[in-house]
Amino acid sequence: MKKLDRSNSDDAKLCALLKESLLNEKEAYDYVQKTMAYNSNFIDGNFLTFEQVESLYNTGSISTREGSMQAKSLAEIQGHFSAFNYLVGTLDEPLSEEIIKAFHYCLKTKNHLNKSPVGEYKKFVNIVGEMQTVSPVEVSTEVKELLERYSKEKVDLDSLVDFHTEFEMIHAFHDGTGVIGRLILFREALRNDICPFI
């Protein structure tokens, strides 16, 4: 598979076309919205099928013959739809703590079962797998330092991977950090003419 080269005018045109399509063509926007919501939430353990996500997006409801469905799964997908709308509306702004916290607010505000702060950094220590994450009192400082370093870098695929890795290691939120990290990757790829990935 050919690697995209941003210095190549054909590749730059392709990335610009993808961004333009996402912003101006409902069909492209709808496809990315549904596919990204499904894939990103599936990675985090959401059990909805793509067809159920598509139905929720298109009609606001899901009919199921498979039995019960968790309210949390529905709320997470609906939250992702809101976060993606917010993402598209902020493409002209540099990445900031406010945008990151707004992603979390969009993702988690519809989940009435969520007992953690919504739109705010974590208040309690958490462990991801066997990895110790940053303590709650250090999160804001660590995120600010990460954003400051990132703002000074030439953004390419490698710097996006580095940013995502550091963001995951900080693990700024009690729940939803992985989904937010993937939203950031998609957003920053679009902002920097890097073909986005879903």
Report the location of each language-model feature.
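FIC/Doc superfamily catalytic core
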Residues: 1-198
